[in-house]
């Protein structure tokens, strides 16, 4: 399984670890993925891997 949000396509980013001596080494920032059940328009449910920020947006949109 890849570390990609199945709704927004948000994936890992690349950056640097920076030490106190300002030495830089590469690192990856991974999305905060959660597995949730989502009910589709036709009434069926599916398990999807969603970023936490996307889940927050979905909850906000569904409450309106």
UniProtKB/Swiss-Prot annotation:
Which Gene Ontology MF annotations are present? structural constituent of ribosome
Q: Which SUPFAM superfamilies is this protein grouped with? A: L28p-like
What are the record keywords, sorted? Ribonucleoprotein, Ribosomal protein
Alphabetical list of Pfam families matching this protein:
Ribosomal_L28 (PF00830)
Can the keyword Transport be found in this entry's annotation?
no
Gene Ontology cellular component list: ribonucleoprotein complex; ribosome
Which GO annotations describe the biological process of this protein?
translation
Q: Which family does it belong to?
A: Belongs to the bacterial ribosomal protein bL28 family.
Its recorded name reads: Large ribosomal subunit protein bL28
């Amino acid at each position: 399984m890849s570390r990609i949000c199945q709704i927004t396509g948000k994936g890992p980013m690349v950056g640097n670890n920076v030490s106190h001596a300002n030495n830089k080494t590469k690192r990856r920032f991974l999305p905060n993925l959660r597995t949730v059940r989502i009910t589709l328009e036709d009434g069926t449910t599916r398990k999807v891997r969603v970023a936490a920020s996307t889940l927050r947006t979905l909850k906000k949109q569904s409450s309106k």
